[in-house]
UniProtKB/Swiss-Prot annotation:
NCBIfam families: L29. GO terms for molecular function: structural constituent of ribosome. This is Large ribosomal subunit protein uL29. It comes from Pseudomonas syringae pv. tomato (strain ATCC BAA-871 / DC3000). GO terms for biological process: translation. Keywords: Ribonucleoprotein, Ribosomal protein. GO terms for cellular component: cytosolic large ribosomal subunit. Transmembrane segments: none annotated. The keyword Ribosomal protein applies. Gene3D superfamilies: 1.10.287.310. Belongs to the universal ribosomal protein uL29 family.
Length: 63
């Protein structure tokens, strides 16, 4: 996901996406804890996506 794509979305859409990403992160952490996570790069990828969404939300709030 690109930051430019996120900037085109509304705050409500971004909040919904953020909740989905947080759920994904939780599920991936549980899979890692139980040894079922085969693609460990997904954890850091989701973490970065969360940071991107939060950054865009803060930028929109500052305007």
């Amino acid at each position: 996901m690109k930051a430019n794509e996120l900037r085109e979305k509304s705050a409500q859409q971004l909040n919904e996406q953020l909740l989905g990403l947080l759920r994904d992160q939780f599920n991936l952490r549980m899979q890692k804890a139980t040894g079922q996570l085969g693609q460990s790069h997904l954890l850091s990828q989701v973490k970065r996506d969360i940071a991107r969404v939060k950054t865009v939300l803060n930028q929109q709030a500052g305007k």
